[in-house]
A protein has these predicted regions:
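Catalytic cores of nucleotide-enabled group-transfer and carboxylate-activating enzymes in metabolic
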Residues: 79-80, 120, 138, 169
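Conserved glycine-rich beta-strand-loop-beta hairpin in the small C-terminal domain of fold type I
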Residues: 156-166, 178-192, 202-205
Length: 260
């Protein structure tokens, strides 16, 4: 079997189905609940379009990676593709890395019934590398209702953390130069900066001041196709007490440009 991988174009609603058709794809890996790094949440209409794409051919499948989906702060959660898939075309993937801890290293996969015989035939020998003790502990944690309570606490904590980070940015020296988007879900958002500097120069000048920036263009196969001056801000790990100093150092870049 030969596998050819490729990237597909995104629009405001997420993955372009027309791009899948043009590429002749049979399998697609997506994160419809909160795409990383763009933060796009795929609307219901596009999800239905994607399911119809999969159903047009007998061996098309969708790998739904629901990573980071548990943290939605505005509106009701959108149903997963797996939950509305009537044709058995969606393979669901998720992990506990965000909701509990990366060190737990436990993820899971839910197969459509039609794939179970093939899985048992081809991969029935597979044994998880995670210790049985950790798996059993997590199972008990969930079965006894503690996981849902923990998740609610984490949602509240990250909601407060997100609000604090955004308030600090909007009340700081970059308030007139920064536009925040895609902040309603997940543990990151985008921040577009008003600057004539190319991304590489902006990142270099920030690094000279001890501030590490993650540019959206770094995630593109073709960086030139990315919208310029957009930062990917993973706010969950930000030290809120150090953020004002980091923003002040970034503001120095504009001050130097204004006096150049």
């Amino acid at each position: 079997m030969t596998l050819t991988d490729f990237s597909a174009a995104l629009d405001a609603a997420g993955l372009s189905v027309a791009a899948l058709d043009a590429a002749g794809a049979d399998v697609v890996h997506i994160s419809p609940s909160h795409h990383y790094p763009t933060g796009i949440v795929m609307p219901i209409a596009r999800r239905q379009e994607l399911l119809h794409w999969a159903e047009r051919e007998p061996d098309r499948f969708i790998l739904e990676d629901d990573y980071d989906s548990e943290f939605r702060f505005v509106g009701r959660p959108i149903p997963t593709l797996f939950s509305v898939d009537e044709g058995g075309r969606v393979i669901y993937l998720n992990t506990f890395s965000k909701t509990i801890a990366p060190s737990i290293r436990i993820s899971y996969m839910v197969l459509p019934h039609r794939l179970l015989p093939t899985f048992r035939e081809k991969l029935g020998f597979y044994s998880s590398t995670v210790s049985g003790f950790e798996q059993y502990t997590l199972a008990r944690f969930m079965a006894e209702g503690y996981y849902e309570k923990h998740l609610n606490r984490m949602r509240k904590r990250y909601h407060q953390k997100r609000d604090a980070v955004i308030a600090c940015i909007r009340g700081g020296p970059l308030a007139e130069r920064a536009r925040i988007t895609e902040e309603d879900a997940g543990l990151h958002f985008l921040m577009t900066l008003d600057t004539p500097l190319p991304d590489g120069a902006l990142r270099r000048l920030a690094a000279q001041r001890g501030v590490r920036l993650a540019m959206l263009s770094e995630y593109y196969n073709d960086p030139a196709a990315a919208p310029p001056h957009v930062l990917v801000v993973n706010y969950s790990g930000i030290d809120i007490e150090k953020l004002p100093r980091a923003l002040a150092r970034l503001a120095e870049i504009w001050e130097e440009q204004d006096h150049a």
